[in-house]
Amino acid sequence: MLIYVFLFFIFLMFIRISVIDWREHAIYDKDIVLTMVFVALYKVFYGDFFSSFYGLAMGLIVGLLIFSVVYKVYGFEAFGQGDVILLAALGFFLDMSFLHYFAFAMMLNGILGVLMLLLSRKHAEDIELAYAPVLLVWLPLYFYFNKPSLWAIYNLLFS
């Protein structure tokens, strides 16, 4: 029963981060730290705490790669430090399945982005979109499908 309490607070923090990022285009360190504390407690009691560091490292590496590419392309911080740390926190939570979720979310975000461009009267360069809500909105769906692997995601979308 306690597992659901931890999961509730983790998802509540992800919702809080998403709403604040949507409104203010900022992710606060205190929210990320509190999320990491809830994830660490959850992992200590119900998961493999040490294997979660693999996911944390993967999230951090992916976040830093995106940050550096976006900074080189745009010349300013369009993908910020909060987004990088959010990916690390998400990796810590999802551990080994982080890359699978990231691919899952990016595929669905690609479809969403094309629909936004088709339905919007704005040009692509005029659309500002906060990253946290777009990344985290698919998390319940990912858990609903029982955290599928990349191959299962491919079969789900294209079969």
Task: Pin down the residues of each PLM region.
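A membrane-topology feature that recognizes alpha-helical transmembrane segments
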Residues: 1-159
